[in-house]
Amino acid sequence: MDTSLPVNRRAFLTALAAAATAHSLRAQDRALVTKTPPKIKLGMDNFAVRAMGWKAAQLLDYAATLKVDVLLISDLEAYESLEDAPLREVKKKADDLGIEVYAGSWSICPTSTRFKKNWGTAEEHVRLGLRVAKTLGSPVFRVVLGAGEDRKTEGGIKARIADTVTVLKACRSQALDAGVKIAIENHAGDLHSWELAALIEEAGPDFVGANIDSGNAAWTLEDPMDVLETLGKYTICSSLRDDMIWETPDGASVQWTAAGEGLIDWKQFAARWSALCPATPIIIETISGFARNFPYKKPDFWQHYDQRPEAFAKFETLAKRGHAIPSFKAPEGVDRKKAEQDYQKGELERSIAYLRTKIGLGLKV
């Protein structure tokens, strides 16, 4: 009898089991690779360095030094010309630098306190922006309704939303023809996140989306993370920064900060961003150096806000965690304009560095 057969059989079965285990591990590795979230593009908004007064070409040169993927030029005044030929030159420069340009402008609500007639009627403004965006290769045209003051106007914010929706619907065919979506920002306390979501649904999410602003989230007394959960599925552009919030005798104060220097958990924020709107860039718009108090403990405060206790409770939790920080003040003996320029660049550059090195954002190294 061949007594070596059981030994060989055991060896064979052992080897087979090892191979199966190795194959299983490789399959798990492949699954992990498959499930690894895509890298999120990292960008800057030109408003972050507004004190520089740069035009598009200078903004692109600066953006290249930061190695960002996207430059949001959020106002039409930043171009030397809005004619197609000069805009194509801007696009060529951006392409050569490996930077995507996103186009934007300001209020398109004709009854907003922030609306200006620089670009004609609200509809003419939108159509101009769509043409600019298409020429630049921008997938979006970022706009705003207005500001918190609009909540106090006749008819309140609901009337301003209705007026904005009317403008958007009048421009639907042009947006679809251009292949450009209109991104509405929650801007300067004008819209709660749920109000912006309702505006988008009413106008038509096939051509309208959200430009989420984490700083302005705090100006409607919301947690930026909560705002992302509400608007994430609509988000096609962004203007982000951090928030420091702290309690005051009559409510809470909000001061915007560089990313990583406030209360936002950016690892968690980026993880949810990756799940909700992974193709949308995280664009930094630092606006820092001053605080605004919200006296929500006064009885007449809430008449202009849509109070939702569960949402407000999350804001209050942030206020309890935060602490007062000083406002920006130009150093003694330093030219104020130069100090402001240096301050703005510092806030933006620290934010980009933090999000790239600590959070892993951006396609470039």
Description of each model-found segment:
Residues 40-45, 71-73, 101-105, 141-143, ...:
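Hydrophobic faces of well-ordered beta-strands that scaffold small-molecule active sites
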Residues 72-91, 148-152:
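Glycine-rich, proline-tolerant flexible connector loops at the mouths of alpha/beta enzymes
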Residues 16-22, 34-37, 60, 93-100, ...:
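Active-site acidic/histidine proton-transfer and metal-coordination neighborhood
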Residues 58-76, 137:
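Catalytic domains of carbohydrate-active enzymes, especially glycoside hydrolases
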Residues 81-89, 117-125, 155-163, 191, ...:
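Alpha-helix N-cap and loop-to-helix initiation/capping positions
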Residues 43-55, 111-123:
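Active-site mouth loops of central-metabolism enzymes
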Residues 2-6, 10-24, 28-41, 57-58, ...:
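Histidine-acidic metal/acid-base catalytic patches
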Residues 47-49, 76-78, 106-109, 146-148, ...:
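Active-site beta-loop-alpha junctions enriched in small/polar residues
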